[in-house]
Design a protein with these regions (language model features):
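NAD(P)-dinucleotide binding in Rossmann-like oxidoreductases
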Residues: 209-286
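Rossmann-like dinucleotide-binding domain that binds NAD(P)(H)
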Residues: 154-225, 230-232, 305
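N-terminal Rossmann-like dinucleotide-binding module
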Residues: 1-51
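A contiguous active-site-proximal alpha/beta segment in oxidoreductase catalytic domains
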Residues: 101-160, 322
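Beta-loop-alpha module in the N-terminal Rossmann-like domain of NAD(P)-dependent dehydrogenases
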Residues: 40, 50-112
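C-terminal helix-rich "cap/oligomerization" subdomain common to oxidoreductases
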Residues: 7, 71-73, 120, 289-327
């Protein structure tokens, strides 16, 4: 029996991870959604009822002591992520945590270090990596040389003073697709004071260590909600429309073009036929893969440092840096 606990029962838990865990428990019978925890009692109790958790708690240490789970999902605000993650890992519990894995290199390193010392697995839930259309894109590219990647992340009316914790999705996804860390990025900020203090559209231009040229548009104050990716390789051009939050591109698509010929056309509904957001957006696969790896007794996963560069670049956005150079 694989026992799972959740810490944090807010919006992200309810929209993405909760439905994914409910489906996982239904498909893998030897699974117990044992406990969920939130500082707000009503939130924990409602989450337990909605997604089939056995018990609700307001103190995570009490929950872990009583249940002794096989895996913990940490879904809390980024300001608390590193501190809580380190505490959970030091107690010896494998952990999957919502991105970002901290606000800076030091917080990420603390999580990675705690996991290494405890000898337990930790995964950061960068769900774009597990989106079926992104997985299909990487599969089609194969060994082709990637020349450039353009990623457009648009939102409507997002007046966040700090958009970096959303921006990190695009930053990590481009690095993941390129299979190479960034070498440098120039950052341009289109300040929009009429929309609110610190509100800005952000544009990143640079290159990876492998030579791929990247352009990333992070537009919280746009006209719609969508995410689109274009990739040119030495053999083909790829266009991806991601289906987040049932947006204008849902259920999404992937097209491979060579000259005037469309060689591949994949609909998002072919890869996630259930049409559920948590499947289309990668929440299900990132959780399922982690739990099944634990169940199979696989080697220890510690991918936290794999996301440290995205955290550093997000921190540059937060601090309004004009340039990022890899160390």
């Amino acid at each position: 029996m694989l026992k799972i606990c959740v810490i944090g029962c807010g919006n992200m838990a309810r929209s993405g991870h909760g439905p994914a865990l409910l489906k996982y428990a239904a498909e893998y019978g030897d699974t117990l959604l044992a406990g969920c925890c939130d500082l707000i009692p009503e939130a924990a109790e409602s989450f337990a009822v909605t997604f089939g958790f056995a018990r609700a708690y307001t103190d995570y240490r009490t929950m872990l002591d009583e249940i002794r789970p096989d895996a913990v999902c940490l879904l809390c605000p980024v300001a608390l992520t590193s501190e809580l993650a380190v505490s959970i890992l030091r107690l010896g519990y494998p952990l999957i945590l919502e991105k970002p894995p901290g606000r800076n290199r030091e917080e990420v390193a603390a999580i990675a270090g705690a996991a290494s010392e405890a000898g337990v697995s930790v995964r950061t839930a960068f769900n774009r990596r597990y989106t079926p259309l992104v997985q299909a894109l990487i599969g089609l590219i194969g060994n082709e040389r990637i020349l450039n990647i353009t990623y457009q992340m648009y939102r409507r009316g997002r007046r966040d003073a700090d958009f970096s914790t959303t921006s990190i999705h695009a930053i990590d996804a481009v690095r993941f697709i390129a299979k190479s860390p960034y070498r440098h990025l120039d950052l341009t900020f289109q300040e929009l004071p009429e929309a609110g203090a610190e509100v800005a559209n952000i544009y990143l231009n640079g290159q990876t260590e492998s030579g791929t040229v990247v352009q990333i548009s992070l537009v919280p104050m746009g006209g719609t909600v969508c995410e689109r990716i274009s990739v040119n390789t030495d053999e083909a051009t790829y266009f991806v429309e991601l289906p987040f939050w049932k947006n204008c591109d849902s259920p999404g698509s992937l097209i491979r073009v060579v000259g005037a010929e469309v060689t591949h056309r994949i609909a998002g509904s072919d890869l996630a036929p259930g049409g559920e957001m948590f499947e289309e957006s990668g929440f299900y696969e990132e959780n399922r893969g982690f739990f099944e790896h634990l169940r199979a007794g696989g080697s220890v996963i510690n991918d936290t440092l794999d996301g440290v560069q995205a955290v550093e670049i997000a921190d540059c956005i937060r601090r309004r840096c004009g340039r990022y150079d890899a160390e």
